[in-house]
Each structure stands twice: as structure tokens, then as C-alpha cells.
Amino acid sequence: MTDTGTHRPQGGLDEETRQMVVDTVRQLAKRLLTKKAVLAWDRDEIFPEDAIREMLSPEIGLQLLFIPEAYGGMGGGAKDCCEVVREMCKICLGVGTAFFAIQLGSDPIIVGGTKDQKEKW
């Protein structure tokens, strides 16, 4: 069988969509995760809640990356999550780690939750 390059792993985004999400993260980083802001957070030992909340806002919706499409998410897989987290960590390890923790928090519900729990959360 010849690989046409169109194979999509189960539960993952296609290349075009993944690149669009990564580009969105890069644009957000330029605006929210400036070097000055990141250094101030580190210096003052501040958790950048406002920046993270904006990334998770309904308009942007990065928290939906790992959620199946059947439940209103993007249907991304592990590779997609890693690409997005890697992009965030290039700028601020704290923000990348916080975002990754949010993604991991959805996994128990996706894997073991009831239909009602999946629809609610």
C-alpha cells in the first residue's frame, strides 16, 4: 500500500488544522506572552491566570483541543496536544505546563466518564 500522506491517526487533527491551532498559539504568544510579561511573572512569582483564561476563552477555545468532536471539541490527539504545548513552552514553561495539565484533566472523563459526564464537562 502506498502512503499518500493523507493518513490521519485516530483521534487526531489533520495537518492543516493542527498548523492552524499552532499558528493561533503563536499569535497569542506574541500578544499575551511577551518577554517582558514572562520575566515579570517569574520575578514576582505570579501565576499568569489572566493570560491562561484568555487562551481558554470561548472565542479561542484551546481547551477543546483534546475533547472529541462528538462533545463539541476539536478531536485532537496526543500529537496535537504535544505540538501546542511545545509551542507554548518555547515562550513560557509555566503556561505550557498549566495548559498541558488542563488537557490531561479531561482525559479521565473522556476515557471513563459516563455519557452524561462527557456531555456536561
Q: Where are each of the predicted segments found?
A:
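N-terminal glycine-rich flavin-associated loop
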Residues: 96-115
